[in-house]
Amino acid sequence: MSWTEAEVRELKVGRYILIDDSPCRIVDITMSKPGKHGEAKGRIVAIGVFDNQKHSVVYPVKHKVKVPVITKKNAQVLSIANNEVQLMDSETFETFVIPVDPADLEKIKPGMEVPYWEAMGQRKIMLQN
C-alpha cells in the first residue's frame, strides 16, 4: 500500500492524487457551493504522471481520496537499447530497465546520473526540461 488518504477540500494544484489507480498531478481544482439538494462538490482535473493522460473526476468535498506516496531517487545509466534504459539505483545498487520516450533518449548518456520517480509499482525517469 503506497498511498495515503486526504479529503478533497485539502487538495491543491500541484499535489498528487490516485485516479483509476494511476498517480496524477492536479492541474485544476474547483469547488462548488453547497446546493439545495446536496453538499459542495470538488471537480479535479489531473495529468497522469506515467501516462501523461488527462483525467477528470468530481467528488463531494468531504470524500476521502487516495494520495500516492511518490519516492524520488537517483540512478546511474548503465546502458541504452531499443528505447529502454538500464539503470542502477544509487542507494540500493538495484538494476532495472525503464522504457523511455524516444525524444528523451538524446538527453541520456551512459554513465550519467538521472532522477527517477517510483509510485504504485511504476518507475519513470524525470529529466529537467
Swiss-Prot record:
Keywords assigned by UniProt? Cytoplasm, Hypusine, Initiation factor, Protein biosynthesis
Q: Name one GO cellular component term.
A: cytoplasm
Q: According to the lineage, what is the superkingdom?
A: Archaea
Biological process terms from the Gene Ontology for this record are: positive regulation of translational elongation; positive regulation of translational termination
Q: Subcellular localization, per the record?
A: Cytoplasm
Q: Does the keyword Iron apply?
A: no
Transmembrane region(s): none
This entry's Gene Ontology molecular function terms read: ribosome binding; RNA binding; translation elongation factor activity; translation initiation factor activity
Flavoprotein: present as a keyword of the record? Answer: no
SUPFAM superfamilies annotated for this entry? Nucleic acid-binding proteins (SSF50249), Translation proteins SH3-like domain (SSF50104)
Q: What does this protein do?
A: Functions by promoting the formation of the first peptide bond.
**Family designation:** Belongs to the eIF-5A family.
Tell me what this protein is called: Translation initiation factor 5A
**Provenance organism:** Picrophilus torridus (strain ATCC 700027 / DSM 9790 / JCM 10055 / NBRC 100828 / KAW 2/3)
Q: Which gene encodes it?
A: eif5a
